[in-house]
Amino acid sequence: MTETEFNNILTNDIKKVEHNLLSFLPDCKDGQESVVQAMEYSLINGGKRLRPVFALEFANACGGSKEDALPLACAMEYIHTYSLIHDDLPCMDNDDLRRGKPSCHKAFGEDTALLAGDALLTHAFEIIAMSDLSDDKKVSASLLLAQNSGVGGMIGGQVIDLIYERQNPSIKQLLNVYKMKTGALISAACLMGCISAGANENQMACASKFAYSLGIAFQIQDDILDIIGDEKELGKPIGSDAQNDKTTYATLLGIDKAKADVEKLTQSAISQLDAFEKTEFLKELALKLVNRKK
């Protein structure tokens, strides 16, 4: 696949997602404008759109339609966006900026930001329920998304990560955090794409293995970039983990070992794609994500 072909597919996928994201927003009623505006503000605030792209591309890899997967892809991005709003709150990471713009609570106030996050979370499941997919697929997608974004996935990973900020976690414990915090939502995205296309059990299993291996590699690469990344390329200061005395994979094992494990995990992820058709784009995307500079 040429660079131009890859970029065309990625651009078209992102355009499809961004065109539909706002169309799923709830209608404003008297007095509710501020929370819907905060939802919209956060949804359109850039980002890689990584998770919805995975949903669309796994639907395609299973022989399904990207159009059928679009509601699930957008629901996935609603969940991801709510998590970012809550991450930025003063009680969590206390970040004033998100992708170079004021974070939601700085733009709309803490109370509205909290409610906007809650609204995005709950509305994600309404998007799935109102889609044209079969009832079985709606139930499967909703259950999967709830499990992977809840205590058994992203939320659980956040809780454990907070605990480890006051401790010195082992590599095994760190990998579990990465699996839950990052891998779980990537897995949900890939699997929801599979669900929309009616994937078989083997494809579901392979998609899950792909997502978790890539998710962990993605997080380790983040750790590496926080040590040796270029601040101009990243668009944020480096060294925040060290300043906060936070233990990461790269600080525990060193840069060279971390880089080697990113490569190993990425190749493990790519090997799972043998269960699918039309995987050239997914292979290239996996490589670009773990070799990124920002």
Explain the meaning of each model-derived region.
Residues 1-25:
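N-terminal amphipathic/basic leader segments beginning at the initiator methionine
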